[in-house]
A protein has these predicted regions:
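Active-site beta3 strand of CheY-like receiver
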Residues: 47-53
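Receiver (REC) domain active-site loop signature in two-component systems and cognate sites
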Residues: 58
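Two-component/phosphorelay signaling modules centered on CheY-like receiver
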Residues: 13-32
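C-terminal output helix
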Residues: 89, 107-116
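Acidic catalytic/metal-coordinating carboxylates
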Residues: 36-39, 62-65
Length: 123
């Protein structure tokens, strides 16, 4: 596939690996990684990836804070929440801050594929 950059932000190394493996099966393999919300913000500003997957509960800055700052920097940023935990309030706040979608962990490859197709269809 085309060489699009995808940022994966999760404090769990295993979760990042699982998401990368699922995305690779969809034909994409150019990844940036972050282990907390602040790293996600910094990485986004430096590399401007086309798609961001972010967990909600993380150290330093959580996913909601990361989404807010990323979207403040780039209102067109395409951010997807991927989380197994998080309160309804946190999920609502993530959507209000500009998250485009939510995927529940554990996720299926088809769910990841649907998100990626929706993002890049027609490019």
């Amino acid at each position: 596939m085309e060489n699009v950059k995808i940022l994966i932000c999760d404090d769990s190394i295993l979760a990042r690996k699982q998401l990368k493996d699922a995305i690779k099966k969809c034909g994409y393999d150019n990844f940036l990684e972050a282990s907390n919300g602040q790293e996600a913000i910094d990485t986004y500003k430096e590399h401007k990836p086309e798609l961001v997957f972010v967990d909600i509960v993380m150290p330093i800055k959580d996913g909601v804070e990361a989404i807010h700052e990323i979207r403040e920097f780039d209102p067109t940023a395409h951010v997807i929440v991927v989380s197994s935990v998080g309160t309804q309030t946190q999920l609502k706040n993530a959507i209000m801050e500009g998250a485009r979608d939510f995927i529940q962990k554990p996720f299926s490859i088809s769910a990841i594929n649907d998100i990626i197709r929706a993002r890049f269809e027609g490019r």
